[in-house]
Amino acid sequence: YSEEDLIEIIEFAKSINFEFASYMSASKFYKDYALKTNDKSKYLEDYNQHVAIVALYLADGNKEQAKQFILAMIEQRYQPATPTFLNAGRARRGELVSCFLLEVDDSLNSINFIDSTAKQLSKIGGGVAINLSKLRARGEAIKGIKGVAKGVLPVAKALEGGFSYADQLGQRPGAGAVYLNIFHYDVEEFLDTKKVNADEDLRLSTISTGLIVPSKFFDLAKEGKDFYMFAPHTVKQEYGVTLDDIDIEKYYDELVANPNVLKKKKDAREMLNMIAQTQLQSGYPYLMFKDNANKVHANSNIGQIK
């Protein structure tokens, strides 16, 4: 852009009348989005100026396109995602994308790597969801010694602390979610972390939780049957495939019948009630319907959604 272009675009943005719809919306903008001095004692821009800077960045040198973006944002016809609206056009900024998906393998090296990666992504303003379904369950064996695995909860707690610590320069808090397959042995403990009366040492108070739910679970609930939760490490030992990657529709009955696979059972409808009660108390867990997502997966040739 030339200097004349910049002046013209800024004046165009200032000429459009904008009023916040509520005190809450004005407070949200000036608290979380407006550029401030380093000591945060003064604001350096108003809403129209902020929109102009975002539009200039997105238009990438196209003056008329920048004006169209400004008009669309001020008229509330278009709203960029939070990281884009916060960071576009700034020299000292995070990334412009919203979400990152990670997966933990069943090893301490992987746990440490994902913990570090999640902090780095949180630092640049990303929301991070992490699949914990490959981790061995509480009480499983490590190097043949039974009863020593700690399960998924300590990992979830460590990640929660990381997201609280690594925010975006105090401008935007870290946001993370941990997901677990509903057939995982630790799923009941995982649900308990969001109950209002959960022990503070176990409660996940700031990180979000979600369940990955294959259609097989709903089939069992519909038929009024028990469903089994399996210890992932014993599944991997028997079949060479992780619980998260195995075709549960195909192998479920075989897993139930295999005496070498550690498992426990619960009425499927009771589990649905448990999920509903936890959601009523906390709003969690999120539910990801795995098979439905994969039926309409546009990039199924690359791999499955899990």
Please provide the spans of the model-predicted regions:
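Extended catalytic cores of very large enzyme megasubunits
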Residues: 1-306
